[in-house]
Regions:
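Long, basic/Gly/Ser/Thr-rich N-terminal segments
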Residues: 2-122
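Hydrophobic residues in beta-strands of the RecA-like P-loop NTPase core, especially within AAA+ ATPase
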Residues: 193, 373, 409-410
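P-loop NTPase motor domains
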Residues: 182, 197, 201, 207, ...
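Glycine-rich phosphate-binding loop of nucleotide-binding enzymes
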Residues: 135-230, 466, 496
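Conserved ATP-driven motor cores of ASCE-family P-loop NTPases powering translocation/secretion/packaging/pilus
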Residues: 2, 394-478
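P-loop NTP-binding catalytic core
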Residues: 99-157, 476-478, 482-483, 488-490
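Phosphate-binding and hydrolysis-coupling loops of NTP-dependent motor/remodeling domains
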Residues: 2-8, 16, 43-45, 89-96, ...
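The Walker A/P-loop phosphate-binding site
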Residues: 131-159, 163, 313-342
Length: 496
């Protein structure tokens, strides 16, 4: 094949001009000179001779200078030194839309000397497929560096699950609040498993955040759409009591809740007590079990009775439990406030609720819904087996078939069961620095470029990498301000 020389002139400057393509050029990436300042991860556009306008993203920026070590020392001594410098950028090609509206990448290289410009809003929206679908979409924020709204498809989130991943203090509960606000606007049925009592603030109107005008968000409260239940209404005042019956628990289940180290010793006595009670009634309490054991007058039962007294004090069991159809109400959001509840009791609550919701959803007795799980590493851990591990694996693999979606929230991605995390097709990733967590995230996210993976540990507060949820590729998004009051602020030791 003969090579053909062509002349390129410098009359390309104009609005948004960045530089020109040079050097070795391919159809999927190229280098360009940088005349006007451009930032890493910024979108640019360039005209391809057969494909028309093509969108790209700046992956790397480099400044080359002729300043040697010796001359740098002169600068340090205050002597004037002339420094010549050149700035260049590596651009990865995202593509263009063909006549069928499919995203395509050119099959031939770009031409040397072709001008590179900052991408226009229309080009970004067209190529990335960012439509303002307010009917089916959750407004997450603005494309980083551009005033382009980003919407996540709600149906895709329910059908294919969501994960929100961040380091401690990275803003995961804040963005979870943003997502839940959007679900409430669209009247999606939600249940939130809230170990720290952070989400009750969704009932309260927030303050006008700095820079909120860019996002067109106004403070709002959702008190009418929310109900709150808790196993401990003494700590979590204003919550409705959450109660369970004992009828579905066998002797081994009850002993596991007591944390007893003498399971074998107590198992026979407890089974005998349960058999006696079940012959008389289906509705019995921990106090009823204690009374049966006390009547036996067996000294070996003394420690078992003490352990059952602990369960009785928790007051989570009753003759009549809370019905699931009280918790799951169409178009409403229910918060299960577990603040102050011991970890073993939290496991019981989460396991019982998640199992019941899945079974009733399969039967169509409760509406399609989202189950939001905060501190997910505590309820579906990668290492070890706890009561709720099995149901979350089942929900992750089968929940989508029955319209039960998960929102998995954690600051320790590496500690969440990989079978659960890998099933989350919509991922919202904030700043993460732990190497093990980064490895877990990168292995679970499709389409993440090497440069974007590097960016995870450098993300500023308020910026997230989002993928799935109707997005065709991972995008960096400035998260919109909350409409409601954020309930997950860190406690200040020294007040302002």
């Amino acid at each position: 094949m003969e090579s053909a020389a062509h002349h390129r002139t410098s009359s390309h400057r104009g609005d948004g001009f960045v530089g020109v393509i040079y050097g070795d050029i391919g159809p999927t990436s190229f280098r360009c000179s940088v005349v006007e300042a451009v930032e890493r991860m910024e979108f640019v556009q360039v005209v391809h001779e057969t494909c028309g306008t093509v969108l790209g993203r700046v992956e790397e920026i480099q400044r080359k200078t002729d300043l040697s070590l010796d001359r740098a020392q002169l600068v340090g001594d205050g002597e004037p030194v002339n420094v010549e410098e050149r700035v260049s950028a590596q651009v990865s090609v995202i593509g263009y839309r063909d006549d069928r509206r499919l995203l395509q990448v050119p099959r031939t290289p770009f031409r040397a000397g072709e001008p590179v410009r900052r991408a226009e809003t229309g080009t970004i929206q067209d190529v990335l497929g960012l439509t303002e679908d307010k009917k089916h979409g959750a407004y997450a924020g603005l494309l980083s560096g551009h005033d382009v709204p980003v919407y996540l498809d709600i149906n895709a989130m329910v059908q294919k699950h969501v994960s929100i991943l961040a380091k401690t203090g990275g803003g995961k509960s804040y963005i979870a609040g943003v997502l839940i606000e959007e679900l409430m606007k669209h009247r999606v049925t939600c249940v939130i498993l809230d170990p720290h009592g952070e989400y009750a603030s969704l009932r309260e109107k927030g303050k006008v955040a700095h820079g909120a005008s860019r996002f067109h968000v106004e403070p709002r409260a959702y008190a009418d759409a929310i109900q709150i239940f808790s196993p401990d209404t003494k700590i979590n005042t204003g919550s409705r009591p959450l109660k369970f019956t004992l009828s579905n628990l066998d002797a081994r289940d009850i002993l596991s809740l007591t944390g007893s180290a003498r399971v074998r010793t107590h198992l026979t006595a407890l089974r005998k007590a349960l058999d006696l009670l079940r012959q008389a009634t289906k509705d019995y309490t921990i106090r009823d079990i204690i009374r049966v054991l006390e009547r036996e007058e067996d000294p070996q039962n003394a420690s078992l009775i003490d352990e059952l007294e602990y369960l009785s004090e928790v007051e989570i069991f009753a003759k009549e439990g809370t019905r699931i159809d009280e918790l799951v109400i169409k178009a409403k959001t229910t918060i299960i406030n577990l603040k102050g509840v011991p970890p073993d009791i939290q496991e019981l609550v989460v396991n019982r609720l998640a199992t019941a919701m899945f079974e009733l959803r399969k039967l169509g007795r409760i509406p399609p819904m989202m189950l939001v799980v905060e501190e997910a590493h505590n309820f579906c851990p990668q290492v070890g087996q706890i009561a709720s591990s099995k149901i979350f694996r089942t929900l992750a693999s089968e929940g989508r078939k029955f319209g039960l979606g998960l929102v998995v929230i954690t600051q320790r991605a590496a500690k969440v069961d990989k079978n659960v995390l890998s099933q989350c097709n919509t991922q919202i990733i904030l700043k993460v620095t732990n190497p093990n967590d980064l490895k877990a995230i990168i292995s679970s996210v499709e389409g993440l470029t090497a440069s974007m993976a590097e960016e995870i540990s450098r993300l500023p507060i308020g910026v997230a990498i989002m993928t799935g949820g109707g997005l065709e590729m991972p995008l960096m998004v400035e998260v919109r301000p909350r409409e409601t009051r954020h309930g997950g602020e860190s406690v200040k030791v020294i007040e302002d």
